[in-house]
Structure formats: structure tokens, C-alpha cells
Amino acid sequence: MLDVSGGTATNVTQHDGAILKTNTNGTTVSGTNSEGAFSIHNHVADNVLLENGGHLDINAYGSANKTIIKDKGTMSVLTNAKADATRIDNGGVMDVAGNATNTIINGGTQNINNYGIATGTNINSGTQNIKSGGKADTTIISSGSRQVVEKDGTAIGSNISAGGSLIVYTGGIAHGVNQETGSALVANTGAGTDIEGYNKLSHFTITGGEANYVVLENTGELTVVAKTSAKNTTIDTGGKLIVQKEAKTDSTRLNNGGVLEVQDGGEAKHVEQQSGGALIASTTSGTLIEGTNSYGDAFYIRNSEAKNVVLENAGSLTVVTGSRAVDTIINANGKMDVYGKDVGTVLNSAGTQTIYASATSDKANIKGGKQTVYGLATEANIESGEQIVDGGSTEKTHINGGTQTVQNYGKAINTDIVSGLQQIMANGTAEGSIINGGSQVVNEGGLAENSVLNDGGTLDVREKGSATGIQQSSQGALVATTRATRVTGTRADGVAFSIEQGAANNILLANGGVLTVESDTSSDKTQVNMGGREIVKTKATATGTTLTGGEQIVEGVANETTINDGGIQTVSANGEAIKTKINEGGTLTVNDNGKATDIVQNSGAALQTSTANGIEISGTHQYGTFSISGNLATNMLLENGGNLLVLAGTEARDSTVGKGGAMQNLGQDSATKVNSGGQYTLGRSKDEFQALARAEDL
């Protein structure tokens, strides 16, 4: 560091980062720095470099030319001193109480203090602050830079380029402003503020508490304070107009990406809202807003009522207690908070509405947005999107493609589910839902009471969920698990059904209905019709199931199953079927390591199996007893889709292959009888046989 104040230093070599502290008061310094030769002589400083804590005072009647102020460098131009062609780089600071001309600001800061004058400043980036009593003339404000005019500061002839900002505080003065397209003016209508100039549309003024023809864009902002006004304001993308309590605006144009915020008790008349323009307001008493929305409809907020308000693109409306909103449209990124009453809101994609405790919503139409209900919502229509009933309640909701979620002690009453989903979460309750074409899903800790399950609808009761008082039609799909806490109801045929304490009784499964009988639980007298399925897990037991077009998958134990036309019982590895009765058109499939004993195979019934290891089968048919044990099949009857695969190293004896039946022998067989319409294959691969079995040419 070199500190020279009033002394002499010659032949100085100032390296990068070196600190020079000096002034022009009787000081003589000469040498070189990274920018070239520099000197201070006879009160004149030339080409001085200031950085890293370096400082230069230009004393009264002294001057500085081509000073460079870098990071952490500072220069003070004192009263009656002058500085010309100063360059202020990033992190540099210049304080002016005298005169500064032709300054270039490249990321640094210039402070024009009391009695200071700056002329011809070019702000490429960084900031020029005009303090009380300071003045700036003919300033160019480029993109990314800003000029700040404080109270009693003055800016004359400022040119704001696109991306640049002119910020005028209360009581600041800015005359002859040239506001180019894409530039930002930040100001207010407070006492003493005096601004005039030209923007892309016209001559504009902010003076005497009134703003006229102001254009706001690209972070530009005008605050209209109490007892002042603004007329003919244009709010473009990135611009914002704030209307405070007891302030007034007239003829505001709110364009796409602009924001009009009318605070409680503010007034905005003749608003012209274009698509994408954001309105922020409330229904607080004393607030007055009138105009046309982006759909061309008249809207208003007055006398504690909002009508036809459009909220989008960060727009929001707060409906306070004791007030109401009618026919609001909430588009993408619009928001509505209701503490009072709301009627007829349309929630489009990515719009949000919150109904708080003690508030009400009636006839909302949810089309991709989200409504959260802590209060009461009646007759909502959910076409897409979601309604979340979180501790509140709903009545007569119509779900036609969207989702209703009921949680946290929320309650949904008399919901009509045409398509879409009603999901009941922990501590949520749905009462009296009518399930026509969509789904009601009851999750752990949820409760559905008195649901009507019509043809085409699905009621899904999951582990630790509860559904009581169900009225089930013949084609209503019940999906349930024996891990459900409690399920009760009545089938279309009047039979009562239930699931309690791990036991399922008289369950009807059809049209996509599924009962999962979990390990260490049971089912009794399940009716599985077309499209239904019962899954009996390992260590689970199913007794008395009737399959009429449906399917039972046995991984545990199935007792006394009856398989009617179209029904299929599949015994998986380690599963066991006992006393299954297969009627005409029914099918029993026993896979490797499966077991089926005491079977009754009636005429026209199909048995599908093989002589694989672990398969054990026994039963009776019209020709007597039959069995498969120890890789030996005896007296098997194969017809109407039945088939037997005799594997290599195994044997079949006395088999009968009837019409529609098939047998493939890769091992040995004896006394096989093949009737008309039966298919016997010797020596083909297993894959070829299975392909034939799938075809209807057997």
C-alpha cells in the first residue's frame, strides 16, 4: 500500500491489486499502473487506478481525468472539484459532491450527493444514486443498470434503454425522461414526486399526486398512494400497478403478463383486462373495481361482492368474511381464497381455489384446477382436476372425470361418481356416494358409508379401509381385501355380504371385481361372475366359492369350489383345491406343484394339467375315479378344452380324449382312447402342444 497525502512519490510502479491512497491537495505522484502512466500534480489527477481499498479525494478546485475505480476502490469528488471520464467497474464506488462528467459505470456505483452534479453518465451496468440535493443530467441507462432518484434528487434527460430501470422515490424529480420499449419505470404518486417524459405510447406525467399515461413493463411499477390517482395506465409484461387504500385509478389497460393490485379500499374504474393480465384484489368493504375481463364480459368488485372476475397468471382474489364472489373464472396460475361465500366458480387447468373454515362454495365447476375445502362446498362438478376435502365437507358433488380426495376428518355427502375417482384417505368419510361409472377407493383409515355401487362402477376397499352399508348391483365391481377393517352390504339378489376380522362372506365379484384373500384370512361363499376374480393367497382359505364366468386363483387352499360355465379355477404352485365341482363349460387348471383332490368332474367340464413333479390330482367323472400322482396319470377325461401334457419320463394310463380335448405324450401312455373331436399328439414339443391347445382345432 502507498499512502501519499500532500507529499511526493515519483517513479511509482503500481502492480495489480496494489493499494494507492492519496488526494489532489498538494500531492505529487507519478508512475505506472496496469493501465499505463499516471500522475497527480498541481491539483490534477490523471489515469489513477483505485482498487482493493485504494482511495482518491479530489479536493476543492482539484480535478481528475480518466480515473479507473475497480473492486473495493473508492473516489470522492468534493465540493467545487471535478472528475471527467471516470470508469467505475464492478465493486467500485464514486461519491460526487462536486461535478462529474462523462462517467462510465460498468457494474459499480456512483452516488450523487448534495450539491453534486453528474453530466453525461453512461450506466452500462450498475447503479447511479441521486441523493437529496444531487442532480444528474443526460444519463444513459442501459440494460441491467439503474438510476435511483431519492427525495429531493433530480434527474434531467434520462434515457432508459430496454432492460434498464429508472427508480424514483417519493419526492424525487425526473424530467425529460425517454422511456424506451422494454425499460422499467418504478415510481409512486407520493407528495413531491415530479416525473415527466415520453414512453412508447405518449407523453406521460406523475406530478401533483396524479399519474397520466404511464407505461409499466419489465419490472416497472407504479404505486398510487392514498388520496392520489392514476389515469390511462398501461401495464405490459412484467409491469405492476399498485392501488393503495383511498387511491383511485381510471382507464387502466392490463395486458398479458402485467399485474394490477388493488389493495383493500382502493378504487380502479374502467379496467380493460386482456388475456394473461393478473388482477390481485379482495372483496373488502370500500374496494371498488369495474371493467371488462379477458372474455369481454363486464366485471366488478363493489359493495363486498365480486362478479365475473378472471384470475390467471398470478392473479388472486380474496373473498373476505361476509362477502361473496359470483361466476369467477380461475385460469392457469390464478388463485382464489374464500373466507365468505363463492358461487359458480370455474376452475380451469392449474387454477387453485381454497374454501376456508366457515366459508362456502356452491356449484363450482372444476375443469383441471384444484379446489381445497376446509369449509363447505355444495354441488361441485369435477370434470377434471381435483377437489380436496381436507377437514371440510361437501354435498352433492358430481364427479365426471376428475378426482375428489377426502381426508383429515373431511366428509363428502351424496357424491355422484359418473367417471373419475373418489378417494377416501385416513380419517376421511364419504356418505351416500352413488358409483355409476367411476371408482370409489377407500384407503387405510378411510370410511365409506351407504355407497350405491351400480353397474359399471367400482368400489375398492383397501387394507384397513372400511365400507359399510353398500348396495351392490349385479354388475357393480367390488375390489376388496380381507385385510379391510370392515365391509358390509347387500347384493342385488338380496344376500348380505361382509368382510370383518379377516373373514369374507358372500362376496359378489363381477365386471372387474376382485377379492384378495390374504394369508391367514378366509372367504366363504364367494360368488364370482363374468369378469370377477378371487385370489386366494398362501396360507389363506376359500370355502364354497361359485365361479360363473369368473376366475379363482388358488395359492392357498380352496374348499368346495363350484365351477360353472365360463368359470376357471387355477391352482398355482403349492396351492390346493379340495372337493372342487366342475360343471359343463367350467375349467380347472392345475399347475406344477399344485394339488386338487376329491374333484367331481361332470360331463363337459375341462381339466387342464400335466404329469409334472409335485402335481397331485384325484377325483371322479362319468368313467370312474381318476388321479395324477407320482408322475402317473390314470383314467383322465379330457374334453371341451381340457388337456393333459405327459412329460418325458412320466406316464398316462387309460386316458379318454373326448371332443374338444387334447393330450400330448412326450413320455409313455397306454390304453388311451381318442373319441371324435379329440386330439392326440405324440412327441411334439411342449410349446407346440400349448399352441395347439390354444387353437380351436383340437
Where are these regions (language model features)?
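Long, low-complexity, polar and repeat-rich extracellular regions
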Residues: 1-698
